Amino acid sequence: GAVACCGRSAVARGVACSRVPHVTLMRDTGDMKISADFTVMPDDFAKAAAPEYRTDGVPVISFPFYIDEIDPAARYLHWAFTDPDSIPVCGFEWIHWPVANLPIDALMYDFNDSHALQIPPDFSRQLPSMIPETVQGRTSAASKLVGSTNPQVTMRYNGPQPPDKDHDYSLHVWGTAKPLPGLNQGFWLNELFHALRDVDHVTDQGVMFITGKA
């Protein structure tokens, strides 16, 4: 699987969340493990995607991944798929896919699968009809520097298309006991960060990195 980063969450250490500074809750890596069946993003989800897997030239079929060892107190999932390696290229971390308020109970469990939860391929495009209460945020395609106005691109998964060399993409997933308030379809990523800092029920989190080929 992809490289997964895991540690001890405040809850797992027995520290009351209300007594931990908000920024610590957000930044301290939890017990949750995020993984995939690949370390390099497959073509269908990235720069080499076929025309039928693109919208306005952008790969829009989201990749599958697994979430394991989730804190039992977690009831909702939120994530941000971003490209830190875009910073030297364009001056900021490119936002590829923010998601918030995904109810864990809405995900199907396969008791024959060794993984606790699986996010299936093409989940981004299926979400509005499958789980309408879950919201997807704006990608960097919505920025004034890019100017896309198509919501199928600005508020859906955008696959890796590094222009200069291979980039390592970050998928950061958080678990909370309750939904995050104030987030609507098309939220900006900073709004997700503010919401995570402003609540006292962030129970767990995990990160993995996937390489996108140039």
Residue ranges and their predicted role:
Residues 5-6, 17:
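Cysteine-centered motifs
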Residues 25-214:
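N-terminus-centered regions that define maturation/targeting leaders and the start
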